[in-house]
């Protein structure tokens, strides 16, 4: 395997390669490349987000995160349709990312719920037809981040400029990497194939309802950071119900682990080191091969910002509470919605007979 090929491996792939290598010299080489890759990706991510922050303003650093996530995914993922029509999907997705989060922050919670339902459903239809790609973890996450870190006035204009630039970059990279895909399905087929009886469509509806309603409940309660519960719900609401239970347990447990580690670091480290805690979390994510520890280290960046706004104890308590509530709420809704679907199916069968 070449140096470049090893750089393309996931953390799990690199760890498996190191584990399976018997020759000590080759093993050291693989370990060195793996470490190099982790820090290279970290430096690249920090550089991209820094550039966006410098050009668009510090409050728009989230645009850099959103675009970066999309670029990393669109290098390899597709939409299950013709590549030229995939470009239309990208334009539609970015149109929602530009308008949806801003408008939802301008209206009362119930109206915001309706806007979220429409926007998230469209993101699912346009970006998540190829279920195994897990594209929702990129596009819906981007929507929630932009909504949670809202801006107005000139900063919003700069946000629009940044997202439009990101859209063009994504379109170029997507077309370059995916132009030889053999799909015959068109953009409009994504909407034509919306069928309440299909597992894919039921997942669309389930995720959209769970995420939007969870954020509505938090907003009506007057709690900050409603996006945290939305992200938690999105993260554990998987296409297949049998996968949900394990993901929920990992989300709840390792979110607490991450918060505990963050709290210790926040107390032990000098205040001058606080801005680097998020970066430490990013390195931890790079070394994490599984969802559990990725969840733990992902808490660092979010808490670094929230601790400065609300104080560390409240930020940690809020993070733990919203994530636990989101996981439990998703589990409950998943079971109820699946039971309703089974009952409807059984009734239809009995009527047909």
Model regions and ranges:
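Alpha-helical transmembrane segments and their membrane-interface boundaries
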Residues: 1-260, 264-297, 305-353
